[in-house]
């Protein structure tokens, strides 16, 4: 008798999970059907240092140019979760568009990847999407201490978030998240509405780095974009 009841309970649970998944699937991965954007800014020196440790640092981004924060991507998001690869194959991305984005996204492979995985989910064409990427980046002011970083800097996630909040009126601590690896600051992720206004995003904020101290490796020298 116990086994019968247990099997019935398991079956009921599976039905609920399947129903919930089906409800999500009706919306999931439909181009243009999302709630907000996340602008992900990667601290390039951390990326290059970590990539070099694995023996695969891309020359375009990790050569001699002094990159600081670069655009990793502008990602359509749901309030929980995110769409990806909304069209397969993705509409063709012209190389002139790729070239036009290299000041913000320094590796062509990154531009192609971001379009295929995230850009098509915006519901915009290639030119329209990357225009929005550029506008989103222009909305964010990089705090002064991180513009020309000549020496390694030890920070806390809270310090970095607070610096961005102070530099960007309208941005709140629940609308930004710092990510990290085992010891380095990795990215700063900023939530924006579809019309590129700062907004809160509880799901992104919950997944922020929880380490006490992080290192920001220095830039390669010279002056980076701000």
State what each model feature region is:
Residues 25-46:
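Short N-terminal segments immediately surrounding and downstream of signal-peptide cleavage
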Residues 38, 52-226:
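Domain-level detector of nuclease and nuclease-like folds
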């Amino acid at each position: 008798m116990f086994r019968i009841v247990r099997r019935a309970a398991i079956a009921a649970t599976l039905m609920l999970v399947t129903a919930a998944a089906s409800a999500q699937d009706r919306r999931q991965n439909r181009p243009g059907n999302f709630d907000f954007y996340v602008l992900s800014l990667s601290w390039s020196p951390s990326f290059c240092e970590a990539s070099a440790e694995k023996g695969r640092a891309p020359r375009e981004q990790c050569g001699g140019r002094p990159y600081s924060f670069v655009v990793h991507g502008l990602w359509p998001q749901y309030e929980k979760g995110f769409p990806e690869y909304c069209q397969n194959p993705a509409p063709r991305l012209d190389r002139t568009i790729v070239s036009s984005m290299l000041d913000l996204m320094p590796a062509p492979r990154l531009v192609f990847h971001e379009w295929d995985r995230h850009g098509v989910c915006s519901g915009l064409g290639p030119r329209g999407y990357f225009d929005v990427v550029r506008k989103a980046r222009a909305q964010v002011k990089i705090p002064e201490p991180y513009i020309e970083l000549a020496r390694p800097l030890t920070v806390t996630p809270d310090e970095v978030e607070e610096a961005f909040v102070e530099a960007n009126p309208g941005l709140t601590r629940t609308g930004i998240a710092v990510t990290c690896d085992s010891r380095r600051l990795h990215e700063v992720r900023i939530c924006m509405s579809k019309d590129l206004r700062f907004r809160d995003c509880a799901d992104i904020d919950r997944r922020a780095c929880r380490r006490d101290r992080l290192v920001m490796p220095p830039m390669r020298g010279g002056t980076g974009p701000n």
